Every structure is written in structure tokens, then in C-alpha cells.
């Protein structure tokens, strides 16, 4: 009985150390890409692996908590985070939804990429296989069950996968990754176009 208890304790300590090393390594790599732009190609699958949809566009991220996510195909949409609020714009229906940043991404692992709040890491488990890191939520009520980030040899983010709690998942492949994009100063500012309805949920 004592041997089993000791073995269990050793395994627990070992697994905790592996998690700590993986989380620390991931945090270090993310800190190295505090600003980047890229093109993305998204493929959405159902829980059985059947392809449901494809999309593509441009992504710009500046930590902490600023990003510009512009989907250009098959339909245009825009998500802009200015550090405080998140704006979700659908040109087709001429409506924009405004959300508090903490409400929009706090309960998703994406906050680990966009943000720099170290206290949030305690809500997730991190495992590592080579340059692939899997971030799993400890909260069973979250919409996103896990988030997988893949880095290339230059430590650029080459891909990330999002698995929802219901089983549907999306894979995002990044190309034209640029750590030094030229900013004009308005990339993370959203101005409501004339005639567009505002759904303010802040």
C-alpha cells in the first residue's frame, strides 16, 4: 500500500513538472511573438471529422489584448479587439456587436495568445509533443475544450486547432507569418460605419 502511494505521488510530481515545463516553454514562445501578422486558412469539421466549411483571411495580433481578425472568404466579417472591447462586425447584415474583452475571450484559450496575464494559466493544463502544445481547459463548462498550437523551426506559429466542447473543431493554417508588420496606428480601432446597427453588450 505504501509503495503504491509512493508511486502515485512520484507520478503526480513528475506529471506536474512536465506540465510546468510545457507551460513555461509555451509562454516563452508566445512572448517572442508579441506582434505578428499572417494569412489564415480555416477548415471546420463536425465531431465525426466531416468537413463543414472553409474560410480564409488575414490576422494581426499585438499583445496584450489587441487583434484584428478579417475573414475575407467565403463571406466577409471582421473582429477587432482594441485592448478593452471586442467588436464583431458582419457587413452582410450591417450589424456590429460590442463586447467587453474579458467577456469575449476570458473563457477561451485564445486569451493566452492575445493576452499576457500569467494568472490565467492556472485555468489550463498544457502538454507538449515536440513543437506542438495542447492547452486544455480545467473548466468543464467552457465552450472551447482544447486549443492546440504548432510552431515551425523559426518559432513562428504555423497552425492552431480549436476543439469545441460539443466535438466540432476548426484547424487554422497560417502563412506569410510576419513578426514585424508595419502598423498605421488604426488597425485595432473600430469605427462604426454609417448605417450599421450597434448591438452593445458591454
Curated annotation (Swiss-Prot):
Q: Which GO annotations describe the biological process of this protein?
A: lipoprotein localization to outer membrane; lipoprotein transport
Where does the secretion signal sit in this chain?
1-20
Its principal location? periplasm
Question: Which SUPFAM superfamilies does the entry mention?
Answer: Prokaryotic lipoproteins and lipoprotein localization factors (SSF89392)
Q: Which domain of life is it from?
A: Bacteria
Among Pfam families, the record links this protein to: LolA
- Where is this protein found? Periplasm
What does the record note on quaternary structure?
A: Monomer.
Q: Which family does the similarity line name?
A: Belongs to the LolA family.
The UniProt entry, under PANTHER family, shows:
OUTER-MEMBRANE LIPOPROTEIN CARRIER PROTEIN
Q: Please give the name of this protein.
A: Outer-membrane lipoprotein carrier protein
From which source organism is this entry?
A: Aeromonas hydrophila subsp. hydrophila (strain ATCC 7966 / DSM 30187 / BCRC 13018 / CCUG 14551 / JCM 1027 / KCTC 2358 / NCIMB 9240 / NCTC 8049)
Q: Print the organism lineage.
A: Bacteria, Pseudomonadati, Pseudomonadota, Gammaproteobacteria, Aeromonadales
Q: Which gene encodes it?
A: lolA
Amino acid at each position: 500500500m505504501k509503495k503504491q502511494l509512493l508511486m502515485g505521488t512520484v507520478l503526480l510530481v513528475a506529471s506536474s513538472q512536465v506540465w510546468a515545463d510545457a507551460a513555461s516553454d509555451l509562454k516563452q514562445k508566445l512572448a517572442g511573438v508579441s506582434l505578428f501578422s499572417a494569412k489564415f486558412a480555416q477548415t471546420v469539421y463536425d465531431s465525426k471529422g466531416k468537413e463543414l466549411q472553409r474560410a480564409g483571411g488575414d490576422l494581426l495580433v499585438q499583445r496584450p489584448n489587441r487583434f484584428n481578425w478579417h475573414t475575407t472568404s467565403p463571406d466577409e466579417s471582421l473582429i477587432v479587439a482594441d485592448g478593452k472591447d471586442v467588436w464583431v462586425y458582419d457587413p452582410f447584415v450591417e450589424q456590429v456587436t460590442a463586447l467587453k474583452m474579458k467577456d469575449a475571450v476570458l473563457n477561451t484559450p485564445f486569451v493566452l495568445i492575445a493576452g499576457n496575464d500569467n494568472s490565467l494559466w492556472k485555468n489550463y493544463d498544457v502538454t507538449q509533443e515536440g513543437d506542438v502544445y495542447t492547452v486544455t481547459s480545467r473548466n468543464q463548462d467552457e465552450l472551447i475544450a482544447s486549443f492546440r498550437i504548432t510552431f515551425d523551426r523559426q518559432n513562428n506559429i504555423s497552425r492552431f486547432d480549436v476543439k469545441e466542447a460539443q466535438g466540432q473543431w476548426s484547424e487554422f493554417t497560417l502563412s506569410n507569418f510576419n513578426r514585424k508588420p508595419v502598423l498605421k496606428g488604426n488597425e485595432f480601432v473600430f469605427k462604426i460605419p454609417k448605417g450599421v446597427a450597434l448591438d452593445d453588450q458591454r
